[in-house]
Amino acid sequence: MTDQLTHFNEQNRARMVDVSEKDVTKRVAVAESQISMKPETLARIREGRIEKGDVLAVAQVAGVMAAKKTWEIIPMCHPLPLTGIDIQFAFEDETTLAITGTVKTTGKTGVEMEALTAVSVAALTVYDMCKAMDKEMIIGPTSLQSKTGGKSGDFHRGEK
């Protein structure tokens, strides 16, 4: 793995990396985020009693849409043909909702940013739908858990 930054040109200005010479490989990235809230708020999400609707269904769709649009909001991301996006939720305890996003493609560049964007927007959507009853919700941490495929090799959080 290289420590050299690749998003700058000879004039030290930002550029989109040229991936035309890279090999096409299967790539998978998994990201996680969480949102902490009052126990009553999480209970109402679990029971489907939020006035704006089914929070998890809307957040799931928002996460999928965000992954597909990542290249439009992160300036140096490449537009990618994503082959799979999965957003999952877990009630970690009485105050924490965990969000996991898995994004897949077969291409010349990875999908880490798509996975991170997916879980971030899913968490923001939960916040938006519940803010009327709980403005003290906290989003994070958000992190890349793993990525496979590509020139830089595989990454699994916690492994050396």
UniProtKB/Swiss-Prot annotation:
GO terms for biological process: Mo-molybdopterin cofactor biosynthetic process. Gene3D superfamilies: Molybdopterin cofactor biosynthesis C (MoaC) domain. InterPro entries: MoaC (IPR023045), MoaC_bact/euk (IPR047594), MoaC_sf (IPR036522), MoCo_biosynth_MoaA/MoaC (IPR050105), Mopterin_CF_biosynth-C_dom (IPR002820). Pathway: Cofactor biosynthesis; molybdopterin biosynthesis. The active site is at D128. Its EC number is 4.6.1.17. Substrate binds at M76, C77, H78, M113, E114. It comes from the Bacteria. GO terms for molecular function: cyclic pyranopterin monophosphate synthase activity. It catalyses: (8S)-3',8-cyclo-7,8-dihydroguanosine 5'-triphosphate = cyclic pyranopterin phosphate + diphosphate. Keywords: Lyase, Molybdenum cofactor biosynthesis. Belongs to the MoaC family. Homohexamer; trimer of dimers. This is Cyclic pyranopterin monophosphate synthase. It comes from Brevibacillus brevis (strain 47 / JCM 6285 / NBRC 100599).
